[in-house]
Amino acid sequence: MTVPMATDNKLSFATRAIHAGYNSADNEGSLNPPIYMTSTYAFESVEQGAGRFSGEQQGHFYSRISNPTQEILETRLADLEEGEAALATASGMGAITATLWTLLAPGDQVLVDKTLYGCTFSFMEHGLKKFGIEICYADFTDHSEMAAGLSDKTKVVYFETPVNPNMRLIDIAAISSLVKAYSPNIKVIVDNTYCTPVLQRPLTLGADLVVHSATKYLGGHGDLIAGAVVGDAETIQQIRLFGLKDMTGAVISPMTVFLILRGIKTLPLRMERHCHNAQLMAEMLEQHPAVDRVFFPGLKSDPWHDLACRQMDDFGGMIALELKGGYEAGVRMLNRLRLIKLAVSLGDAETLIQHPASMTHSVYTLEERKRHGISEGLVRISAGLEAVTDIIADLEQAMAD
């Protein structure tokens, strides 16, 4: 894996993951950021308070809007994603909903890829539609089909890449170019949870905003729930003051912020191991007689391999597969695992496995899953940090006759 290195006097990614946004000299020499457990902030005068509320003066005034610990994380995330600003939230869905409530109004359209994380799909299909917002689905790997979905009502184009759970890849630069040629006012939003900025930086490829479930790789240890959105400073401020403050209240805890900051320090190292383990696991699974198909962009046989080589710095830690025998074979394999944990989520130190149709994507009906490309027998694996020989041995014994 190639972690972005220093260029033009800018520190390398791994260094910025540890230092960006924080100066110990400003905090009594504390090597780690302080955790500001406060809901409100004292003003020196009425005039100062009024200035902060109006936005004419910089500074914190209520922790539903901002917090000093949170500000460090937001500065670091913006730096790593190469955006102007960031907003941290209480969950990934908090980031997504706060963003879309800010950008959309009744009568607007969102053009989305046909396959989405289950809760994102549910919010689009069962949330936004209730408020007069049109949701249009298209296969974003077919650029003609995607372009045909654009209209004068389109305000947002939204997709994940790699796609959860079936590991399709979408060309960020190509989609962004098509959208901006149609209208520069349409916001292109990319969920970068699977890759993190270590592997992929959508803003540099033409996207306007990036969203994350920080619960996953950014935190990295399965002990927190959080989210983030990164983009231009003006839009992020609008999301902060409306989508977060007024619409969702999805406020992140300072303690959670501290844990994410700690996690990000080791993010480049962890992603290297996740990628290494996933590559070897996918190569084994591709050759296994019990496996019908493996979906992993690091395999040369994968239809998205060439795009991954152009768009990503490595192939990630997520694998999807279908076993011969379909759903029943998948259930048998999952129930026989000893080391690998049967659990939703991803990006933890532990290797996790789950069945999307009955778990993370069960909010789709059977017909919706068929239409959106999620098979009943699909199994999703998040490669952990264990010795890959132990992970592979567990998979092999679980698939044995």
Regions inferred by a protein language model and the residue ranges of each:
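N-terminal glycine-rich, Lys/His-bearing helix-loop that initiates the first secondary-structure elements
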Residues: 1-57
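Conserved PLP-enzyme active-site core in the AAT-like
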Residues: 6-9, 17-26, 85-290, 295
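PLP-dependent enzyme catalytic core of the Aspartate aminotransferase-like
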Residues: 2-3, 125, 134-136, 155, ...
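Acidic-histidine catalytic/liganding microenvironments
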Residues: 80, 285-289, 337
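Short amphipathic alpha-helical segments
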Residues: 58, 84, 225, 256, ...
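Conserved N-terminal alpha-helix of the aminotransferase class I/II PLP-enzyme fold
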Residues: 45-94, 124-126
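Conserved C-terminal alpha-helix-loop-beta "cap" of PLP-dependent enzymes
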Residues: 293-379, 383
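Glycine-rich beta-alpha junction loops
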Residues: 22-24, 37-43, 194-196, 216, ...
